[in-house]
C-alpha cells in the first residue's frame, strides 16, 4: 500500500491528526456526529470518534480507488479466482444470494439452495424422532460460526432440540458434554471440510462409540465419500460443502446444520436473508457511502497510519459474547499474511491482533488498560437498541455504559493527580442493531466479512488461504509416535527435553 500514488498524502494527514484531540475534531466538523453515521438495514454505525477528518478520508478513498476496490468486489461476487494461491473462487456470498449475472455465481447459488432444501428435510426427520440433543463436532470455521449464531439466537425456553458444541481435542471437552446426555436420545453431527482434521476425527470416534454406531450420526464435508466411509454414515445423512467456500466463511452453508437445528430452519433462512441484504449494500453502494468499505479503511488507517497493533471488540449484549472469538478467527486467519498475492513481501504491517469480550464484564478486567495504558487500542462497541428480555432497567444500564465508555475513551479527563488523569484520544466505532434478530446478525457478520476483504485488497494479500496453520499440525502428527513411545527420533533439543518430561 505504501507504493500507491496517494500514500504520501495520506501519511501527511496521519502526521497532522496523530496527536489531534477527538473533541477538537468534533468542534471542527459540527455535523460530524450525523455525517459520520450510517443506517444500513437493521444496523446503525457511528464513526464520529475515529481520528480522521474529511480530508484524510478522501485520501483513503483515493487509495481504495487506486487499488480498484470496486472492481475487487465485482470479482469476488462474480466467482473469479480471488483465492489465487489455491486457484479458487471465494463464493460464500452465493450461499445466501444471487446478486450478479455471472453464470458461475448463479450456479453455486442454485447448488447451495438444493443442499439447503436437503438440510431442511433432515431437520424435519430429526424433529419427528425422540432425539432431544445434538452434539456438533468440528473445529475452527466448522465450529466458531455455528456456535456463535446458535448461542446468540437460541430461544430462551421451549427449544425442541438442544445443540452442544465440541471442538477441542482435549478429551475433557467431550467428557463433560456427554456426561449430561442420554445416548438413546442424542444425535451427532461431524463437520470437517476435508475429514482429515485430527480433532474432529478423534472426537468423532468417541461420539460414534458412545452412540453405539452411526445410526444417528450426520456429517458435513467437502469430501462426502471420505466422511461416509470414516464413520459408516449413510450417504443420505451426509451434506456437502465445497472448495469455493472457506471454512471461516462457511456458516451459511450446510455447516450451518447445527444452527438450523438450534434456532429453527426458518430463522436460519432469515439469517441468510440478512447477510444477502448487506451483501447488496457492499457490492452496489459507492465507496464513499459503503459501510463495509469505511469499516475496512478505518482498520487500515488505525493499523498503518496511526500504528495501532491491536483492535478490541466489545459486545454489549450477552447473547453476542462469542462474537469476539469468531471475529478473531475471521480477521486474523484471513489477514495474518506477510506476502502479497505475487509472493513478494508486504510493504506495510497487516493484521492487528483482535480480541475483546462482553460488556459490562470487560469494564472490570481490561478497561483499565484501555483508558490509562500506554497503548492506544481502537475498538468496536456493539449493542442493541431494543431488547426482548423482561428486564428493561438492565438494558438501559447496559446502553448507558456503551455511551459512557466511548465518551470517556475519546474525551478523557484532566486531573491534578496524574494517577486520576485520563488522556482520551482512544478511537471507537459504535455499531447498534435495531434488535438481535436473525436478519440483523446475518447483516453484522456479512459486514465484518466484507471489511476483512477491503483490508486484504488494500494490502494486496489473499484473505482466503491459511497456510500458516499447517506447519504446527504437521509437526504434531510427526510427534505422536514419540509421545506414544514408538519412536525417539526427534531433532529439536528443546522438544526432546519436553518429551522426556511428558513421558515421565
Swiss-Prot record:
Q: Which Pfam families match?
A: PGI (PF00342)
Give the source's domain of life in one word: Bacteria
What biological processes does GO assign it?
Answer: gluconeogenesis; glucose 6-phosphate metabolic process; glycolytic process
Question: Which terms in the GO cellular component ontology are assigned?
Answer: cytosol
CDD domains (UniProt xref): SIS_PGI_1, SIS_PGI_2
- A single MF term (Gene Ontology): monosaccharide binding
**Function summary:** Catalyzes the reversible isomerization of glucose-6-phosphate to fructose-6-phosphate.
Q: What family does this chain come from, according to its entry?
A: Belongs to the GPI family.
Q: What is this protein called?
A: Glucose-6-phosphate isomerase
Q: Which top EC class is named for this enzyme in its record? A: isomerase
Localization terms from the record: Cytoplasm
Q: SUPFAM superfamilies given for it?
A: SIS domain
Keywords, ordered alphabetically: Cytoplasm, Gluconeogenesis, Glycolysis, Isomerase
Task: Name the species this protein comes from.
Answer: Xanthomonas oryzae pv. oryzae (strain MAFF 311018)
Q: Which gene encodes it?
A: pgi
Its EC number is 5.3.1.9
Is this entry keyworded Cytoplasm?
Answer: yes
InterPro entries in UniProt: G6P_Isomerase, G6P_Isomerase_C, Phosphoglucose_isomerase_CS, SIS_dom_sf, SIS_PGI_1, SIS_PGI_2
Residue numbers annotated as active site: 333, 364, 473
Amino acid at each position: 500500500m505504501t507504493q500507491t500514488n496517494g500514500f504520501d498524502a495520506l501519511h501527511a494527514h496521519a502526521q497532522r491528526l496523530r496527536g489531534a484531540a477527538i473533541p477538537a475534531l468534533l468542534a471542527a466538523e459540527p455535523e460530524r456526529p450525523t455525517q459520520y453515521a450510517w443506517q444500513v438495514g437493521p444496523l446503525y454505525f457511528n464513526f464520529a470518534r475515529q481520528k480522521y477528518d474529511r480530508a484524510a478520508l478522501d485520501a483513503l478513498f483515493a487509495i481504495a480507488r487506486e487499488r480498484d476496490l470496486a472492481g475487487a468486489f465485482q470479482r469476488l461476487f462474480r466467482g473469479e479466482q480471488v483465492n489465487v494461491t489455491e486457484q479458487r473462487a471465494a463464493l460464500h456470498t452465493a450461499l445466501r444470494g444471487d446478486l450478479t449475472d455471472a453464470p458461475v455465481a448463479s450456479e453455486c447459488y442454485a447448488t447451495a439452495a438444493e443442499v439447503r432444501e436437503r438440510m431442511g428435510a433432515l431437520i424435519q426427520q430429526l424433529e419427528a424422532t425422540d432425539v432431544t440433543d445434538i452434539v456438533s463436532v468440528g473445529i475452527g470455521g466448522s465450529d466458531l460460526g455455528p456456535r456463535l449464531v446458535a448461542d446468540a439466537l437460541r430461544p430462551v425456553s421451549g427449544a425442541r432440540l438442544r445443540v452442544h458444541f465440541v471442538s477441542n481435542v482435549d478429551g475433557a471437552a467431550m467428557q463433560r458434554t456427554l456426561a449430561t446426555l442420554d445416548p438413546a436420545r442424542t444425535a451427532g453431527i461431524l463437520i470437517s471440510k476435508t475429514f482429515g482434521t485430527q480433532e474432529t476425527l478423534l472426537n468423532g470416534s468417541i461420539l460414534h462409540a458412545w452412540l453405539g454406531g452411526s445410526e444417528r450420526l450426520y456429517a458435513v464435508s467437502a469430501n462426502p465419500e471420505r466422511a461416509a466411509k470414516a464413520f459408516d454414515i449413510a450417504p443420505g445423512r451426509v451434506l456437502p460443502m465445497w472448495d469455493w467456500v472457506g471454512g471461516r466463511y462457511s456458516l451459511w452453508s450446510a455447516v450451518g446444520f447445527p444452527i438450523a437445528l438450534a434456532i429453527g430452519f426458518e430463522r436460519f433462512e432469515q439469517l441468510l436473508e440478512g447477510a444477502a441484504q448487506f451483501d447488496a449494500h457492499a457490492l452496489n453502494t459507492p465507496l464513499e457511502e459503503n459501510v463495509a468499505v469505511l469499516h475496512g479503511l478505518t482498520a487500515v488507517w488505525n493499523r498503518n497510519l496511526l500504528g495501532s497493533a491491536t483492535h478490541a471488540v466489545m459486545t454489549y449484549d450477552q447473547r453476542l459474547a462469542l462474537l469476539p472469538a469468531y471475529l478473531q478467527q475471521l480477521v486474523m486467519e484471513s489477514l495474518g499474511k506477510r506476502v502479497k498475492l505475487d509472493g513478494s513481501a508486504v510493504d506495510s504491517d497487516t493484521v492487528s491482533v483482535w480480541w475483546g469480550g462482553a460488556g459490562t464484564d470487560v469494564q472490570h478486567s481490561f478497561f483499565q488498560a484501555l483508558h490509562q495504558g500506554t497503548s492506544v487500542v481502537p475498538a468496536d462497541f456493539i449493542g442493541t437498541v431494543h431488547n426482548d428480555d423482561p428486564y428493561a432497567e438492565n438494558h438501559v444500564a447496559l446502553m448507558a455504559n456503551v455511551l459512557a465508555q466511548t465518551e470517556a475513551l475519546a474525551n478523557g479527563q484532566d486531573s491534578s493527580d496524574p494517577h486520576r488523569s485520563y488522556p482520551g484520544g482512544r478511537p471507537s466505532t459504535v455499531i447498534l442493531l435495531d434488535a438481535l434478530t436473525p436478519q440483523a446478525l446475518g447483516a453484522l457478520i456479512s459486514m465484518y466479512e466484507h471489511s476483512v476483504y477491503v483490508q486484504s485488497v488494500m494490502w494486496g494479500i489473499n484473505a482466503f488461504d491459511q497456510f500458516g496453520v499447517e506447519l504446527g499440525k504437521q509437526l504434531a502428527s510427526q510427534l505422536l509416535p514419540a509421545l506414544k513411545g514408538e519412536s525417539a527420533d526427534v531433532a529439536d533439543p528443546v522438544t526432546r527435553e519436553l518429551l522426556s518430561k511428558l513421558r515421565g
